[in-house]
A protein has these predicted regions:
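Outer-membrane beta-barrel translocator domains and adjoining extracellular loop/strand segments
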Residues: 1, 23-32, 64-72, 77-80, ...
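Surface-exposed extracellular loop regions of Gram-negative outer-membrane beta-barrel proteins
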Residues: 1-28, 32-42, 158-167, 185-208
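Residues on the lipid-exposed face of transmembrane beta-strands in outer-membrane beta-barrel proteins
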Residues: 2-4, 17, 39-43, 86, ...
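Outer-membrane beta-barrel channels and translocator barrels
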Residues: 6-9, 44-48, 91, 101-105, ...
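Residues that define the transmembrane beta-barrel architecture of outer-membrane proteins
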Residues: 31-35, 90-94, 103, 140-146, ...
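Outer-membrane beta-barrel signature, preferentially recognizing the C-terminal barrel domain
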Residues: 47, 59-108, 115, 133-145, ...
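C-terminal beta-signal and adjacent terminal beta-strands/loops
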Residues: 59, 228-267
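Gram-negative outer-membrane beta-barrel transporters
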Residues: 111-120, 132-206
């Protein structure tokens, strides 16, 4: 890694090398080398603020489980089968951050773009009277992300509030499918400290991920915790979702042959 500075601009340039090798009994081996460059530019602005740009390229390799051609029975209609022809692929990531702080006020604005051509993602197809679940190097997977964080505090070393709101937009392009999905989310926190007592509250909405044809849902939760500290002793009492009863976590698959939707509730 090389670091340097030109006036208010700091920069870092690095590169790594990754070797991927795998071989299964009775199959040909596969070996792949990839260069993983990364670049960071940090520009200091007037006051306590800056702009930072980061970009990197990394590689991803298939797991041995994904490569195995052994069939596993899922149910009476579906089987799971690996793909020994999977290849490693590259992941491109870039992000831009603006941060500002003055006194007890703080803000952070962040955006990112991810691009993964030939990404290894799930797919299903019909083979006779069975639905085959497998993996393949698909066309590409893309993600656009944005996030804003605002914070106030600590006020008189006792009270602090923060709020984060963001969005993830997924574009999953397979060899036989194409899906888009947008997820809005937020997070809020508040803390209060007085002498030996501390009170903390946190709220998260669902942060969902979409990969291939599968949506993996996050949790919408609230947490309330109270602490008492005396010297090296800390005693706490917490509650999960104390003010709501709408906990929900869901998983979906959007395949045209065998879609499903699972939802977990806590009452």
């Amino acid at each position: 890694e090389y670091r340097g500075k030109v006036k208010k601009l700091d920069y870092r340039l690095g590169v790594g090398v990754t070797r991927s090798y795998y071989k299964q009994s009775g199959d040909d081996s596969y070996e792949n080398y990839s260069f993983n460059p990364r670049l960071v530019l940090h520009y200091t602005l007037p006051g306590n603020s800056f702009v930072r740009w980061k970009s990197d390229i990394s590689n991803a390799s298939p797991s041995l489980g994904d490569l195995s051609a052994v069939e596993q029975i899922v149910d009476s209609l579906q089987i799971r089968r690996g793909n020994p022809n999977l290849k490693a692929y590259l992941r491109y990531h870039t992000e831009l951050t603006y941060e500002w702080q003055k006194g007890i006020f703080y803000s952070n604005l962040w955006g990112a773009y991810d691009y993964q051509p030939n990404a290894i993602m799930d797919e299903k197809y019909q083979d006779g009277d069975k639905i085959v679940q497998t993996w393949d190097n698909q066309k590409d997977w893309q993600k656009l992300s944005g996030r804003l964080t605002l914070r106030v505090g600590p006020i008189k070393d006792m009270l602090q509030f923060s709020f984060t709101g963001g969005v993830n937009h997924y574009m999953s392009h397979g060899n036989t499918y194409s899906h888009t999905y947008t997820n809005w989310y937020c997070n809020a926190e508040a803390s209060f400290n007085y002498k030996q007592f501390s009170l903390y509250w946190q709220m998260n909405t669902n942060w969902n991920n979409f990969w291939g044809e599968t949506l993996s849902g996050g949790e919408n939760i609230q947490v309330l915790v109270m602490y008492y500290t005396h010297k090296n002793l800390r005693v706490g009492l917490g509650a999960f979702n104390p003010f709501t009863d709408n906990y929900k976590q869901q998983t979906e698959n959007w395949n045209k042959y065998a879609s499903y939707k699972k939802t977990n509730y806590v009452k």
